[in-house]
Amino acid sequence: MDRIVEIEKADFEEEIETSLRPTSFDDYIGQSKIKENLKVFIAAAKKRAECLDHVLFYGPPGLGKTTLAHIIANEMGVSIKITAAPMIEKSGDLAAILTNLEENDVLFIDEIHRLSSAIEEVLYSAMEDFRLDIIIGSGPAAQTIKIDIPKFTLIGATTRAGMISAPLRDRFGMQFRLNFYTSDELAKIVQIAAVKLNKECEKNAALQIAKRSRGTPRIALRLLKRIRDFAEVNNENIINENRAKSSLDALGVNDLGFDEMDLKYLEILGSTKNRALGLSTISAALSEDEGTIEDVIEPYLLANGYIERTAKGRIITAKSCEILGIKYKMTQKGLFDEDQ
């Protein structure tokens, strides 16, 4: 099901997202602690004339992991090569990428948790010793060829840090979790992006967009672009609060950033009242795969207290019951009483 608040990036958005992407830490809104630490580490690496240590970014999709990788490369004054783990199928694929890097370049691997164990084995020596150990042949006749490669910085990005093997994770000298953005931060991002899209967006309008963006810049920018379309058709050069509200309502995004899929998810949990639901059950009810539910739908709901995840499954909270108009009553066991 296509969703206007879908966090995953579609191919057609790549070009316009690049044009809206900040190119320096000074232009990057949010994630203040991460920015300040990275500034120090980059300055130290440049002072020593070394490549930056390897970096792992993790957290929900759409929060700026790729953007930060680009900024790191810009601040270091080096090139960045971008790939995704599913595209690295054989050790030869990785070898081709690494041998084509220049000294101190940045290699960005998205979805790094999806690397196979065989590829990880090759990556270990590359990360630690800047050397490739390639095994040729098999059995007693197998030989290991050692190839020196340029020193480089690996930046890995993942939405599932728990799925990264411990040996790979431990080789990242810097590990940062990206958090959801505040409404004020998102409003600033929206207003800056609106100017780049040749529109003026009033502050109250930007806040309306921010409130419905699930703490995620990618969603905020997608909503802004759709609202711009409504304004364009109505010959409006300025996006005001009324335009933002009416457009968002037309798009089916409510004041909490929920769309039909979120509400259906909560209604499924609310209908059980006195028992938790497992992921497979929710997946079947929503006709969505489990990975999409875990990576896209649930993070925002969990972070904001709309659901809880227990050993027995997912349960609805009082906060969500109030939204749905469902009676919430806890038993001594900590579950919900059924209406009598």
Swiss-Prot record:
Under CDD domains, the record lists: AAA
Q: Gene Ontology cellular component?
A: cytoplasm; Holliday junction resolvase complex
Keyword Nucleus assigned: no
Binding annotation for Mg(2+): 66
* GO term, biological process aspect, one: DNA recombination
- Tell me the segments the record calls region Head domain (RuvB-H): 255-340
Listed A to Z, the keywords are: ATP-binding, Cytoplasm, DNA damage, DNA recombination, DNA repair, DNA-binding, Hydrolase, Nucleotide-binding
Q: Where is this region: Large ATPase domain (RuvB-L)?
A: 1-181
ATP-binding among the record's keywords?
Answer: yes
Q: Which Pfam families match?
A: AAA_lid_4 (PF17864), RuvB_C (PF05491), RuvB_N (PF05496)
Q: Where is this region: Small ATPAse domain (RuvB-S)?
A: 182-252
EC number(s) given by UniProt? 3.6.4.-
> Which SUPFAM superfamilies does the annotation name?
P-loop containing nucleoside triphosphate hydrolases, Winged helix' DNA-binding domain
Show the GO MF annotations. ATP binding; ATP hydrolysis activity; four-way junction DNA binding; four-way junction helicase activity
The record's InterPro entries line, in alphabetical order, gives: AAA+_ATPase (IPR003593), AAA_lid_4 (IPR041445), DNA_helicase_Holl-junc_RuvB (IPR004605), P-loop_NTPase (IPR027417), RuvB-like_N (IPR008824), RuvB_C (IPR008823), WH-like_DNA-bd_sf (IPR036388), WH_DNA-bd_sf (IPR036390)
List positions binding ATP. 20-21, 62, 65-67, 128-130, 171, 181, 218
Q: Provide the reaction this enzyme catalyses.
A: ATP + H2O = ADP + phosphate + H(+)
Localization per record:
Cytoplasm
Residues binding DNA? 309, 314
Q: Which NCBIfam families does its entry note?
A: PRK00080.1 (NF000868), ruvB (TIGR00635)
> Know anything about its domains from the record?
Has 3 domains, the large (RuvB-L) and small ATPase (RuvB-S) domains and the C-terminal head (RuvB-H) domain. The head domain binds DNA, while the ATPase domains jointly bind ATP, ADP or are empty depending on the state of the subunit in the translocation cycle. During a single DNA translocation step the structure of each domain remains the same, but their relative positions change.
**How does this polypeptide assemble, per the annotation?**
Homohexamer. Forms an RuvA(8)-RuvB(12)-Holliday junction (HJ) complex. HJ DNA is sandwiched between 2 RuvA tetramers; dsDNA enters through RuvA and exits via RuvB. An RuvB hexamer assembles on each DNA strand where it exits the tetramer. Each RuvB hexamer is contacted by two RuvA subunits (via domain III) on 2 adjacent RuvB subunits; this complex drives branch migration. In the full resolvosome a probable DNA-RuvA(4)-RuvB(12)-RuvC(2) complex forms which resolves the HJ.
Q: What does this protein do?
A: The RuvA-RuvB-RuvC complex processes Holliday junction (HJ) DNA during genetic recombination and DNA repair, while the RuvA-RuvB complex plays an important role in the rescue of blocked DNA replication forks via replication fork reversal (RFR). RuvA specifically binds to HJ cruciform DNA, conferring on it an open structure. The RuvB hexamer acts as an ATP-dependent pump, pulling dsDNA into and through the RuvAB complex. RuvB forms 2 homohexamers on either side of HJ DNA bound by 1 or 2 RuvA tetramers; 4 subunits per hexamer contact DNA at a time.
Report the family membership: Belongs to the RuvB family.
Q: Which HAMAP family match?
A: DNA_HJ_migration_RuvB
User: What is the designated name of this protein?
Assistant: Holliday junction branch migration complex subunit RuvB
- Species of origin reads Campylobacter hominis (strain ATCC BAA-381 / DSM 21671 / CCUG 45161 / LMG 19568 / NCTC 13146 / CH001A)
